[in-house]
Amino acid sequence: MGSLSKCGNSRSGTPDNFPIRANEEVVAQQEQERHENEILKQQNEELRLQNLAMKEFLKNPHKSIFEHKICIENARLKEKIHAMTIQYNQSYGLNETRMGIDMAIQTKSYLKLAPYAMDELFKLGALNDPLWNKSTHGQGETLDFKLYEWAFPPCLGPKPHGFVSEASRAKGVIPMATSDFVEALFNADRWRDMFGGMIGRCTTKVISNGARGSRNGALLLMKAEIQVFSSFVPVRVLNFIRYVNKHAEGLWVVVDYSVDFGTDRRLTRRCPSGCILQSMPNGCTKVTWIEHTEYDEQLIHENYRGLIRSGVGFGAQRWVSALLGQCKCIAPNLFESTTRCLRSLAQRMRRMFCATVCLTGWERWNLVANVPGRPRIMARMYNNFQGVSGVVMSATHSVWIAANHRHLFEMMLIKDLRSVWDVLCHTIATRDMYSFPLSQDEANFNCVSILDSNTLQAGVNQPLKVLQEASSDTTGSLIVYAIVDTPTVALVMQGGDSSRVGLLPIGLSIVPYHGESGESGSMVTVGFHRLLRNQVISNITVENINTLNRLVAQTVQGLKMLVDPLNEEGM
C-alpha cells in the first residue's frame, strides 16, 4: 500500500504534505474571515449607536450634544452589563453546583449597579463649573454637594444617618502607558505598591477578567484598608466593586462603588469613585481622579477633622500625588540592581512604619498602654530570619507643631540640625553614603538614602548606617529611617535579596493642620520601634514603657525647638 500511495502521488505531481498545507490554508482563511467579521460587527455597532443618537437628537433637539452622548453611553453600558450577566449565568448558572444561588444573585446585583456608577463617574469627570470648585486647601477641586444632589440621584441609596460627605477631583499626567496602568489597578499587590503607604491590607475576588485579550468589562470584588499616618484617624475599611470599561480607543474608565455596606459605622461608603484614563501620544497617561466617600466623622479626632473634610487626607489629590511620586521614582534607573534593591528595602520599611501607626497589615499587636495625651504603646512577638527573637514594642503619638509641613520637613533634612530632633541616630546619620532621588525635579528633597558615620557597632567594630526615605507633596511629608549594619549595606550595593533584612523603623509623618478657627500649622505623628531581646510580652516592665515615652517626648521637644529655639515645652 505504501508503494501505491507513492505512485499515486508522483502521478498527480502532488507533494506528500498536501493535506497538511491545505488544512493550514483553510485555518488561516477562517481566522481572516473571523477577524473581518469582528471588524464588521464593531463598525455595525458604531453605526447603530450613531443612528440611535440621531433619532434621540431629533426627538429632543434642546438637549446638548454632550447630554445626548451621555444618554447613548448609558444605554450602551446597560446593554453591555446585560450581555455580561447572560454570559456569566451561562458560564456558572444560577443553580449550578459551581456557584450557590445566593452568590449568583449577589453577582447579578453587582453587575446591575455598574452602568449607573460608570455613568455618574464619567459625568463627574466631564463637568466643570459650577459643580466643581477650586480647593481652598492645596490643589485639586471639591464638589458642590447642593448641585450634586440636585443633578444626580443617589446611586447607592440615601446617605447613612449621621454620616458626612467628602468629594474631590484631581488631575495629573503619569509616565506610564494606559494599558499598563489599567493592569496595575486590576492587581491588588501592584495597586498597593503604586500608592506607597496609602493602602494597608487588600484582598480581591475576580468576578470577571474582562473581554479576551483586554481588561474591558473586568469586574473585581475588593476589600481594602486606606490609611492616614496617624493613630488619631481610623483606617478606612472599604468593601467595593471595581469595574473596568474601555470607553473608546485610548480612553478607559475604572469605577469603584461600595457593596455589602451593612450597618457597621466603622465602614466607609465609597460612592462612585475612580479614574478616567486618556492615552497621550508620548506614551503617558492623563489621569482624572475622583474620590467621593461618606463616613462617620465622630470616629475621627477633632484635630484631624478639617484635614479629612478638605480632602487632603483621603481625597483625590492625595491619590494623584502618591501616584505621581511612585511613577517618577520607578522610571529612572529601573534596571540598576542596586537602586532596585534599595528602593525595595525602603518600601518595606515604610510599609512597616505605616502598619504600626495605623494598625493595618497582617501583624497582630497587643495594647500595652493608651493613656490620653500620652503615646500609645503596643507590643508583639518578634522572630527574624537571623534567629533574633524577643518582643518588639512600638510607641505612637500625634502632636500639633506651629510650622508649615513642608518647611518643617526641609528643616529636618538639614544635617547640622539633626541632633536637635533625632534622639537616636543623629550621631550615625551625618553624611550621605548612597542616595537616589525620587523625583527628577532638582528642587525636590524626596530621596532614598544610606547615611554614614564613624560610629562603630558595639562588639563588631563596624560602622553603623541609617537607611532613610524622605518624601513630601502637597498633602503631607514623611521621613522614615532605620539603623542597618554593614553586611546589609553590602547586600544592597550588590543588588541582593533584602527581603530577610530585619528592620525597626522610626518615622515622622507630617500633614497640614486646618483648624476650625483658621489656625494653621502641622499635625506630626511620631513612631518608634524598640526590640527587647529574648523577652516575652508578659515580662514588659514600667521602665520599658517609660523609655519609649521618653524617646517620643524628647523628639517632640526637639521638633518644637527646631521651629522655635526658645520653646522648652514637652509633649
Describe the role of every protein-language-model region:
Residues 1, 16-23, 47, 323, ...:
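Generic low-polarity alpha-helical segments
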Residues 1-34, 55-79, 85-105:
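Intrinsically disordered, low-complexity regulatory regions of plant transcription factors
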Residues 44, 51-54, 58-60, 289:
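N-terminal amphipathic alpha-helical or helix-forming assembly modules
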Residues 86, 94-571:
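Eukaryotic helix-grip
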